[in-house]
């Protein structure tokens, strides 16, 4: 294979370059994509499956090599291993972008690997990875229904920016990653600072304009160097099987849909499926159990979609705009800082808020350096939530993704950390699941924050929207169930308050989703969100004014950066002494912001007093509570601040004459003194007598 390259310019200084033919020539497709000095290598490979499956076995792994920034991992193990949260989230972005572009019944095991080989700290690598993977698929022999591209959109200085730099993203009011084809959007993921629905649509349209440019370039490249597509792995369902199944189940889905409870519905559906297989299965390659199972799923899908399209009725009896019944129990757990049991239909979460000091913050390390997350939401999805037996251990990709979406939704309503200096952890423990559990996490998490007394700016709620698209007939569904998510054409999650949006995520299974459809979905989502917020308001109208008695108390104070070493002391001796003496936890950042946490206000005040003494500057005319360090015939030496000692002469002890200072004070006594002056040698002249008349 010869070396080939193509470039696409999005904006001035932002040119995407794709190369192939030099690296990984044995892969089905391999591309090195680069912008500036950020280079991402991507490969795609396919293998035939030994037996048929009813899903697309697509595996995506994205990895950021620390060598790309000239570093190695810290710690004992220097080899990249378990993926970071950022790598998992980017892998999901690539998967969700590519999966809709692959044929439904492609019976091949497909693996996508994407590596960041060079990172300049300016150009963010994830949209480059999406485009690089799409390019590798386009020129490979793996069948693809359409060419995909992806971009990031930011909002900087009141204008939209495509593939913003890291510095631009640091000040952007929106982060949107979207992927699509020349004609449609397939995936969006983002969060923003209470943007309107129309602003979100505007951002999507802006991003799609650049996606079209990339797709056209990759399409031309594919025509020029692409391999012939191998369609032998695409297996079609014999028409006679689908026809026979349709005939057998005719009229039986009506009775099935009378069952409203999820587990009972699934059991009855499985029983009917087994009956169909038992009646129609034959000893040939056509009427196999697998083909009949696929045909049954298609028949069930067609019936439920038709019911929605023609009658506006859903499988659980709701109208297209009806939200499932909601129940809310705040302060559900007695010893937590804040909690809420949030139930919407058959989806339920036990949301818990925990407050702590900076020591509780989540530490992380990626290509942009080390950091601290003082707010994080962790989503747990145990197998019992869907009545199954399963693995318990480290979180899966789905748990990471759902947790991050809910976290972003709530992050925009948090108070100023200078006014509320707590680290905040939200747990969303899913105890029942039948669709929209990530949006239940937003609602439950918000109520847990309010129950904990976190002074949020405004309540936030989330809702998942669905879509049934048949030819030109569009039906939008509010608050979709798990079945509707599976059988529908769109999963569009939207979170925000009554006025604006804070987070959104959309996955599309079909082409043809226009801006007008998204606009209608967002408008319907706003109505549903407002209804949910009203229900939440009835349960808890505003954040509690007091923190839980079990939550730590935290206060901050500012010291000069050049005084940090004084507070810490040699080898940390001084700060350890303060922590032990006052019974507190202390965190100090590089700017000199000191965070003090303790179980009581008295302990905090004691620590603040000690620190103020350490960093304070003496003032002439100020009165101090000093400690007598030594007594001499002509007076006493008194420490007025740590390390700052002066002489109180015998004549300055009393208005009456005294002959022996030892009769008046002893070493270790506390003595109130006034600083009268500081001489040219920096020595302090103190007076106890001067405080007696004041």
Curated annotation (Swiss-Prot):
Family membership: Belongs to the polyribonucleotide nucleotidyltransferase family.
Catalytic activity field: RNA(n+1) + phosphate = RNA(n) + a ribonucleoside 5'-diphosphate
Any one cellular-component term (Gene Ontology): cytosol
Compartment annotation: Cytoplasm
Entry protein name: Polyribonucleotide nucleotidyltransferase
Primary subcellular site in the record, as a coarse category: cytoplasm
The KH domain, residue ranges: 552-611
Domain S1 motif: from-to ranges: 621-689
EC number: 2.7.7.8
Named cofactor requirement(s): Mg(2+)
Signal peptide range: none
InterPro entries with a match to the protein in the record: ExoRNase_PH_dom1, ExoRNase_PH_dom2, ExoRNase_PH_dom2_sf, KH_dom, KH_dom_type_1, KH_dom_type_1_sf, NA-bd_OB-fold, PNPase
Pfam families: KH_1, PNPase, RNase_PH, RNase_PH_C, S1
Protein's job: Involved in mRNA degradation. Catalyzes the phosphorolysis of single-stranded polyribonucleotides processively in the 3'- to 5'-direction.
GO MF annotation terms: 3'-5'-RNA exonuclease activity; magnesium ion binding; polyribonucleotide nucleotidyltransferase activity; RNA binding
Source organism: Chlamydia abortus (strain DSM 27085 / S26/3)
Binding site for Mg(2+): 485, 491
PROSITE patterns to which the protein is assigned, alphabetical: KH_TYPE_1, S1
């Amino acid at each position: 294979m010869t070396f080939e390259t193509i470039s696409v310019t999005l904006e001035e200084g932002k040119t995407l370059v794709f190369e192939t033919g030099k690296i990984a020539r044995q892969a089905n497709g391999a591309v090195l994509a680069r912008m500036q000095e950020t280079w991402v290598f991507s490969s795609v490979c396919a293998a035939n499956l030994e037996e048929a499956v009813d899903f697309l076995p697509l595996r995506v792994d994205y990895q950021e090599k620390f060598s790309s920034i000239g570093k190695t991992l810290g710690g004992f193990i220097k080899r990249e291993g378990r993926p970071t949260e950022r790598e998992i989230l980017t892998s999901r972005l690539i998967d969700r972008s590519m999966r809709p572009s692959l044929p439904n019944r492609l019976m091949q095991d497909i693996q996508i690997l994407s590596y960041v080989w060079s990172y300049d700290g300016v150009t963010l690598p994830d949209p480059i990875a999406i485009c690089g993977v799409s390019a590798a698929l386009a020129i490979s022999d793996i069948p693809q229904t359409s060419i995909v591209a992806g971009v990031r959109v930011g909002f900087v200085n009141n204008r939209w920016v495509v593939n913003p730099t890291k510095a631009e993203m640091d000040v952007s009011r929106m982060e949107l990653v979207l992927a699509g084809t020349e004609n449609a959007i397939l995936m969006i993921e983002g969060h923003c600072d209470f943007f309107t629905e129309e602003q979100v649509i505007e951002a999507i349209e802006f991003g799609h304009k650049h996606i079209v440019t990339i797709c056209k370039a990759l399409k031309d490249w594919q025509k020029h160097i692409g391999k012939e597509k191998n369609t032998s792995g695409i297996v079609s369902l014999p028409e006679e099987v689908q026809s026979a199944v349709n005939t057998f189940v005719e009229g039986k889905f009506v009775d099935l849909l009378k069952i409203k409870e999820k587990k009972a519905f699934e059991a009855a559906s499985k029983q009917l499926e087994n009956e169909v297989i038992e009646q129609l299965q034959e000893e040939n390659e056509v009427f196999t159990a697998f083909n009949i199972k696929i045909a049954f799923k298609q028949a069930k899908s067609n019936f439920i979609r038709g019911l929605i399209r023609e009658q506006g009725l859903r499988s659980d009896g709701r109208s297209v705009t009806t939200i499932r019944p909601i129940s809310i129990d705040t302060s559900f757990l007695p010893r937590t800082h804040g909690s809420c049991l949030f139930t919407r239909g058959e989806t339920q979460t036990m949301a818990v808020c925990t407050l702590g000091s900076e020591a509780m913050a989540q530490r992380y390390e990626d290509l942009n350096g080390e950091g601290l997350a003082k707010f994080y939401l962790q989503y747990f999805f145990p197998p019992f939530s869907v009545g199954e037996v399963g693995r318990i251990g480290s979180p899966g990709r789905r748990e990471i993704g759902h947790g991050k979406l809910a976290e972003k939704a709530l992050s925009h309503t948090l108070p100023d950390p200078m006014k509320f200096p707590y680290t905040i952890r939200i747990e969303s423990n899913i105890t029942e699941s039948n669709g929209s559990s990530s949006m239940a996490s937003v609602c439950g998490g918000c109520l847990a924050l309010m129950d904990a007394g976190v002074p949020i700016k405004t309540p936030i709620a989330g809702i998942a929207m669905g879509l049934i698209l048949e030819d030109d007939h569009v039906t939008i569904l509010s608050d979709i169930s798990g079945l509707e998510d599976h059988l529908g054409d769109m999963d569009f999650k939207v979170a925000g308050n009554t006025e604006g949006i804070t987070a959104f995520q959309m996955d599309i299974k079909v082409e043809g989703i226009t801006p007008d459809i998204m606009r209608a979905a967002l408008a319907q989502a706003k109505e549903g969100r407002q209804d949910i917020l009203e229900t939440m308001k009835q349960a808890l109208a505003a954040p509690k004014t007091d923190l839980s008695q079990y939550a730590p108390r935290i206060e901050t104070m500012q010291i000069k950066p050049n005084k940090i070493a004084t507070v810490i002391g040699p080898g940390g001796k001084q700060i350890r002494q303060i922590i032990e003496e006052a019974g507190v936890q202390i965190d100090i950042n590089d700017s000199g912001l000191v965070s003090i946490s303790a179980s009581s206000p008295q302990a905090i005040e004691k620590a603040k007093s000690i620190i103020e003494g350490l960093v304070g500057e003496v003032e002439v005319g100020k009165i101090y509570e000093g400690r007598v360090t030594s007594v001499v015939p002509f007076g006493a030496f008194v420490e007025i601040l740590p390390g700052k000692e002066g002489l109180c002469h015998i004549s300055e002890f009393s208005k009456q004459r005294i002959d022996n200072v030892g009769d008046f004070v002893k070493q270790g006594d506390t003595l109130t003194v006034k600083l009268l002056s500081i001489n040219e040698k920096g020595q302090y002249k103190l007076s106890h007598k001067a405080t007696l008349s004041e």
